[in-house]
């Protein structure tokens, strides 16, 4: 199984949301499993891309029925809370709800057992900055040497697509022809 984290800002631009949905749909057909957090924006776009394919996603929630989503993955463990605390610069200032939001990021990167790293992270943050809740996950990914592709690093959607497809080809070298074929159909 190949797991990837699909995360990002609630304020992700519409054209990036469409790209996220298309990429998630493609990755689901390649038997990749999305790990995400059920938030509005990027998380929802990734989920929408693979929701019609059985067992194509693991949605980690900070609490039951977050955003009216049902998932067997809710209520972060004490271990996830401790791990999240390590990566947040002002943990003691967070509310209990904010701590749970940060803790669910650990699962997006390391799975339900907190021991099975995602192969890569696809995300969006404004200008590619390591900020907000997504920034917490990105700091963890960097520490765990998980490759990151941030769709916010470029303003031109065509450059984003080109770099994204190159990134995906690096992640799936054995499927380069299939990725290229999908890229060409996506661009038209």
Where are these regions (language model features)?
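C-terminal amphipathic helix plus adjacent low-complexity
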Residues: 177-180
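Acidic/glycine-enriched connector segments
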Residues: 2-5, 10-160, 167, 171, ...
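Non-Sec secretion/translocation targeting segments of pathogen effectors
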Residues: 182-188
């Amino acid at each position: 199984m190949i797991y990837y984290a699909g995360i990002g800002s609630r304020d992700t631009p519409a054209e990036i949301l469409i790209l996220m949905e298309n990429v998630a749909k493609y990755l689901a057909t390649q038997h990749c499993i999305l790990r995400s957090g059920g938030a509005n924006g990027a998380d929802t776009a990734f989920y929408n891309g693979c929701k019609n394919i059985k067992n194509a996603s693991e949605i980690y929630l900070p609490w039951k029925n977050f955003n009216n989503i049902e998932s067997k993955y809710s209520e972060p463990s004490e271990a996830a809370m401790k791990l999240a605390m390590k990566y947040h610069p002002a943990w003691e200032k967070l509310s209990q709800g904010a701590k749970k939001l940060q803790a669910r990021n650990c699962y997006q990167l390391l799975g339900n057992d907190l021991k099975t790293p995602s192969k890569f992270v696809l995300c969006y943050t404004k200008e590619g900055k390591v900020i907000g809740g997504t920034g917490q996950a990105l700091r963890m990914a960097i520490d765990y040497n998980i490759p990151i592709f941030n769709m916010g690093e470029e303003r031109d959607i065509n450059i984003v697509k080109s770099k994204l497809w190159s990134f995906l080809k690096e992640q799936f070298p054995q499927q380069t022809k299939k990725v290229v074929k999908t890229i060409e159909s996506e661009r038209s």
